[in-house]
Amino acid sequence: LSYCWDDLDMAYMLEALLAAKGVELIWDKRCLKLDDSISQFMSLGCDCSEVILLVSNSYLKSQSCMKEVLEVLNGSEPLQRIRPLILPSAQIFSPEGRAGYVQYWAGEYEHLQKEIRKIGRGAAAGSLNQDLVLLNQIYENADHFLSMLADRYSPTELLEFVEHFCAGRQQQGCISRPSYPLTAPGGISLRS
């Protein structure tokens, strides 16, 4: 599951609905432990047969989420593996909406480039330059990614998405019971 932390409640609901259908999600809240590398975990999306993208406005403006998208896009057969759930806040279905995200990433790139110039390229030779390269990659791929999402049929309602997702997995023989305890924020059990 690729999602923005701003959408954590929706991610827990998605997990609970999928678990009830026998689908176990691999996501940071269940798999990462203290001091684990988030970047290494994010790169796992390249190896998964399916990646659910919980796409919201926050997701599309998150450098971490878009880095994860690039990892998936650079993996094998990304169109066959991406399963987007487009939330209402994501403005991807109009050219103006998509253009707004491309402009956003152009602005993020320009802003960091100016900040690096202020401190000097030598002082920013490490991670800041890597971030600048990443922002440029996000900017260069944003239109392609957003157009791909807008062109695909993907339910925008959570329950409908779960039904379609599980129907596809059942046809492939991929349904199993989650092996970990399911709890929502506050320790509420999601399993009866």
Residue positions per predicted region:
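Hydrophobic/aromatic beta-strand patches that form the interior of the parallel beta-sheet core
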Residues: I52, R81-L85
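Conserved BB-loop
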Residues: M13-S43, S58-S64, R121
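Short glycine-/small-residue-rich Rossmann-like dinucleotide-binding loops
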Residues: W5, S56-N57
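An anion/phosphate-binding loop that grips the pyrophosphate of nucleotide cofactors and donors
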Residues: C48-S49
